[in-house]
């Protein structure tokens, strides 16, 4: 059956089951603006619910986008009382991890402690792993079932991720299954290492506490893995620009996301010129728009069963809550250059 999906994210914004929304793509295509716009629209459309926007990109831009300083702890956005933001710092998380390891065992000669310290410094993708551990902290605050009526939780309806460029993001999303296997091996080792350490004079309460902590982490990882592969709970929004390399990267990302069994059915195309509807377009703009239209046509054919959202190029950066409110409307109601160009020109750089 041939049909075109609505070229907007209205369906995503209105979906009442989503707990996790990932926003990602190649570097420099407007991921932070898109993730911030999605978060703003969610907060506006559902004023009685709480939302959290997390940056897992080492080059944090949320503070710049909202003109407000954010850190490793969730902080309310000024002007949107039901939206909070946080920026995960992998280096700070690494320091915290090492301090926690010290608490479990103060014996510097314990061989197991030495192994753990070596591993935390040498695991490939450790930055993504530490970011993921921060996510695990927040899943405990997530109500997956409405029957969960606990009062000691901050219940976020949805958590939105402003992710790092494609390679980092794919490693991050692969972590639940990777950690699941790794922690399973640790559990197998714990049964063998415990008696062996006792014979060597090591072991004790510190190791028991460490393995108990690993048990808890494994359960959380399994829960996250189940949620990330459930299309009712999790979706991924691809962000790109209308150029060959960006289109190639988007296709590669979609194929990998599908291999992880993660839902993806929305693509946001940023920085479009719409020169056909400009009264006095420059020759360079017309030439570039011609190139953009060529790749837009390819995307329309390749992703006919996706929500393909077309967003305009602005003359200045989109900063501040008010500008994000204006710009994010085009995620819901498709941008019409004949009608909406005035709204774009009204946006002032902060």
Curated annotation (Swiss-Prot):
CDD domains, per the entry: ArsA (cd02035)
UniProt EC number: 3.6.-.-
Enzyme class label: hydrolase
Residue positions binding ATP: 26-33, 243, 270
One Pfam family in the UniProt entry: ArsA_ATPase
InterPro entries from the UniProt entry: Anion-transp_ATPase-like_dom, ATPase_ArsA/GET3, ATPase_ArsA/GET3_euk, P-loop_NTPase
One term of GO molecular function: metal ion binding
Subcellular locations according to the entry: Cytoplasm; Endoplasmic reticulum; Golgi apparatus
Annotated positions binding Zn(2+): 282, 285
Origin: domain of life: Eukaryota
Keywords of this entry: ATP-binding, Cytoplasm, Endoplasmic reticulum, Golgi apparatus, Hydrolase, Metal-binding, Nucleotide-binding, Transport, Zinc
GO cellular component, one term: GET complex
SUPFAM superfamilies in the cross-refs: P-loop containing nucleoside triphosphate hydrolases
Active site residues of this protein: 57
Protein function: ATPase required for the post-translational delivery of tail-anchored (TA) proteins to the endoplasmic reticulum. Recognizes and selectively binds the transmembrane domain of TA proteins in the cytosol. This complex then targets to the endoplasmic reticulum by membrane-bound receptors GET1 and GET2, where the tail-anchored protein is released for insertion. This process is regulated by ATP binding and hydrolysis. ATP binding drives the homodimer towards the closed dimer state, facilitating recognition of newly synthesized TA membrane proteins. ATP hydrolysis is required for insertion.
Family affiliation: Belongs to the arsA ATPase family.
NCBIfam families referenced in this protein's UniProt entry, alphabetically: GET3_arsA_TRC40 (TIGR00345)
Protein name per UniProt: ATPase GET3
Lineage: Eukaryota, Fungi, Dikarya, Ascomycota, Saccharomycotina
């Amino acid at each position: 059956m041939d049909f075109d999906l609505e070229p907007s994210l209205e369906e995503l914004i209105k979906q009442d089951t989503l707990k996790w929304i990932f926003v990602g793509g190649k570097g420099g295509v407007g991921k932070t603006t898109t993730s911030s716009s999605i978060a703003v629209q969610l907060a506006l459309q559902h004023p009685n619910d709480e939302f959290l926007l997390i940056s897992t990109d080492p080059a944090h831009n949320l503070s710049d986008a909202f003109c407000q300083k954010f850190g490793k702890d969730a902080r309310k956005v000024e002007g949107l009382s039901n939206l909070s933001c946080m920026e995960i710092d992998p280096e700070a998380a690494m320091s915290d991890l090492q301090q926690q390891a010290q608490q479990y065992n103060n014996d510097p000669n314990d061989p197991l402690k030495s192994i753990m310290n070596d591993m935390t410094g040498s695991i490939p993708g450790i930055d993504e792993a530490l970011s993921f551990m921060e996510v695990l902290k927040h899943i405990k605050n997530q109500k997956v079932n409405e029957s969960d009526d606990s009062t000691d939780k901050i219940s976020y309806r949805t958590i939105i991720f402003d992710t790092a460029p494609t390679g980092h993001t794919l490693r991050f999303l692969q972590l639940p299954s990777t950690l699941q296997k790794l922690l399973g091996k640790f559990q197998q080792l714990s049964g063998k290492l415990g008696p062996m350490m006792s014979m060597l004079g090591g072991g004790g309460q510190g190791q028991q506490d460490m393995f108990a902590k690993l048990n808890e982490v494994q359960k959380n990882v399994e829960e996250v893995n189940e949620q990330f592969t459930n299309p009712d709970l999790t979706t991924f929004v691809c962000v790109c620009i209308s150029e060959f390399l960006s289109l190639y990267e988007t296709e590669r990302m979609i194929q990998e996301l599908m291999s992880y069994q993660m839902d993806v059915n929305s693509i946001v195309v940023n920085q479009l010129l719409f020169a056909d509807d400009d009264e006095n377009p420059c020759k360079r703009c017309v030439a570039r728009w011609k190139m953009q239209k060529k790749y837009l046509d390819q995307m329309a054919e390749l992703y006919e069963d996706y929500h393909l959202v077309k967003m305009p190029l602005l003359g200045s950066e989109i900063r501040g809550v008010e500008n994000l409110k204006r710009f994010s409307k085009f995620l819901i109601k498709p941008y019409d250059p004949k009608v909406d160009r005035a709204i774009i020109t009204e946006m002032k750089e902060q």
